[in-house]
Amino acid sequence: MFFFFFFFFDETNGKKSKREFDNAKWQKKANKGEWSELYTLYKLLSEQNLYPINIDNINGQRLRMPILSILRHTEQYLKAEYKIEEDGQIVINANGHNIIQIAKSDFDNIAPKLFEAIKKGAPNENGTSDSSFELPEFDEFRRNTCCPNIKCYSKNLGKGEKDKSDLYIVIHDFVTGQTPIQGFSIKSEIGNPPTLLNATDLTNFKYRLSDNLPDEKVAQINSMVDKRGHADIKGRVRAILDQQVSLEFSTINPNAKGEYVFLENLMLVDSMLPQIVSDLLVLSYSEDTRVLSALTDKLSEINPIGFPMKTNKKQYEAKVRRFVTDIALGMVPSAPWEAAHQAYGMLVVNTKGEIDCYHIIYRKSLEDYLYENLKFETPSASRYGFGKIETGPDGCQYFTLNIQLRFMK
């Protein structure tokens, strides 16, 4: 591939800034989801507009948000800004210093090639495709565009919190005339579906058994394994419920300081949300589906909390929608949530290579995408220490489940 790059270092600082990127850790391999993050940058610099999806749009016209610049972090204190000039050319600014200008046509050329390469993957010596692979034919372009890392770097915001935004985009808002900088997370429908909420020790939900089971029954349930020899969490949950014993929500794991951060975060969204999420988690094992929306419908039918639902049957759905949207826009189990969104939406690389933009200005479209495309997933029971009946200091028996949410596509 041949590209024309116009370098215009401001002698001292520009060269120094470029060297910082050249000396940064070079990421050689990545999976399809991570490669999609690099593709998103190049695709947006080619299109130079965002088109937020609005499901309520009936006239077919889409709001256009011109992109003025894109910011991408390589390390905690190393970032590049891709400024789009009036003629469409892109000026790359490294840590405050202009270092290179690249023609828009180069991004027009590279983006579709990168997309096709990501879809194909890279076959290994056995002829199959590894989950992580190299694409060395794009190395030169990556170096010249200050992209030593394939996956976007997540800044450390302190207090155990990572930035949810993969890219920051300065847009021209036609409505207000302002040029705000807005963060976006990136998801990809190429390759394995990504997670929305990752399992950690802090996502363990603890339940009290409504009645203690005999020791021999506890031993039998705790020893249940699946065909692969892993803990059979679904089988264990169903075995407990088959004893006419219910799992009553108790709490969520605290952090090392004894702080119930995730529990309090959920309560900030809605005081009943910890109970609702805990009930959904149990249903995800006792029912034959793991789809979030279907389980929420089932929970609404059961109505365990006893909401008045004669005139409004969306009590559970509305709260679950808020939960997944806040997770997508910034809430994490490890850091206090103040309902201040870090991200303004999601950029989804679809199977055609288009960038679907779900923006908070069309919140319902964003909520619909999340609510209709998520499922519960079982993380490693041995790694996160859940899935066994244990007796607490109070003599009651307890059982722990861990929550992880993954996109279905």
Segments the model singles out, each with a brief description of its role:
Residues 1-7:
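Hydrophobic alpha-helical signal peptides and transmembrane signal-/tail-anchor segments
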